[in-house]
């Protein structure tokens, strides 16, 4: 589910291993010491950062290329992501991979919030394009948008707004 990650990111994601245990698990599964067709074999890969800075080293399943070839094209829809989506949990990873600085602000005092209490990231294809603060009004059986922010470089075109409305 992570695609490519460091041993520390694996430990944090699964929350079952210490970083040292994860590092030892990874060492035992590097493809040079295991058959490449073993589903737990790992390879070392370089991953490009969203900002174009130097690539960072990560680990991936040895069958990564085969997995990538089988992936469907990203959906054309605009997706509203849960703030608790696994890809959003690690803020530094999120920033590095997507150039998206995200923080759920439910525990931040209202006066110190940058966006809002419960803001949802917006995903278009492979890019995080904005954030939306919305809630359900049960009395009207409606979804109420309190605020919408597009990321830098994203044009809030009529087509984009229609795509969001359809979601």
Regions found by a protein language model. Give the residues of each.
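Long, charged, low-complexity, helical-prone intrinsically disordered regions
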Residues: 1-167
């Amino acid at each position: 589910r992570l695609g490519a990650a460091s041993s520390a990111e694996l430990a944090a994601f699964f929350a079952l291993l210490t970083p040292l245990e994860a590092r030892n698990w990874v060492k035992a599964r590097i493809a040079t010491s295991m058959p490449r067709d073993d589903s737990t074999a790992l390879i070392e890969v370089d991953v490009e950062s969203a900002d174009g800075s130097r690539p960072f080293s990560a680990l991936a399943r040895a069958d990564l290329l085969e997995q990538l070839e089988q992936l469907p094209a990203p959906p054309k829809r605009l997706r509203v992501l849960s703030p608790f989506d696994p890809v959003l949990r690690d803020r530094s990873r999120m920033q590095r991979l997507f150039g998206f600085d995200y923080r759920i602000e439910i525990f931040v005092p209202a006066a110190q919030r940058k966006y809002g209490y419960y803001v949802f990231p917006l995903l278009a294809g492979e890019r995080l394009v904005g954030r939306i603060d919305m809630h359900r009004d049960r009395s009207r059986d409606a979804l109420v948008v309190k605020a919408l922010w597009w990321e830098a470089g994203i044009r809030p075109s009529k087509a984009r707004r229609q795509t969001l409305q359809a979601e």
